[in-house]
Amino acid sequence: MAKVCYFTGRKTVSGNNRSHAMNQTKRTVKPNLQKVTILVDGKPKKVWASARALKSGKVERV
């Protein structure tokens, strides 16, 4: 199972670090994902949920 938010689809994205000389090196920006248990078809299931989804109330925990 990939580390992608079950509700919002947020996942790791890539970007660049920039120095004062404007040199660039690759970096990754990771979302704040938490493992939560939810009910799917009446059965408990563990999924990754972003902190933003948890705070906004999109997640109904068991």
Curated annotation (Swiss-Prot):
Domain of life: Bacteria
InterPro entries, per the entry: Bacterial_rp_bL28, Ribosomal_bL28, Ribosomal_bL28/bL31-like_sf, Ribosomal_bL28_bact-type, Ribosomal_bL28_sf
Keywords: Ribonucleoprotein, Ribosomal protein
One Gene Ontology cellular component: ribosome
Single annotated GO MF: structural constituent of ribosome
One annotated GO biological process: translation
Family affiliation: Belongs to the bacterial ribosomal protein bL28 family.
HAMAP family: Ribosomal_bL28
Protein name as catalogued: Large ribosomal subunit protein bL28
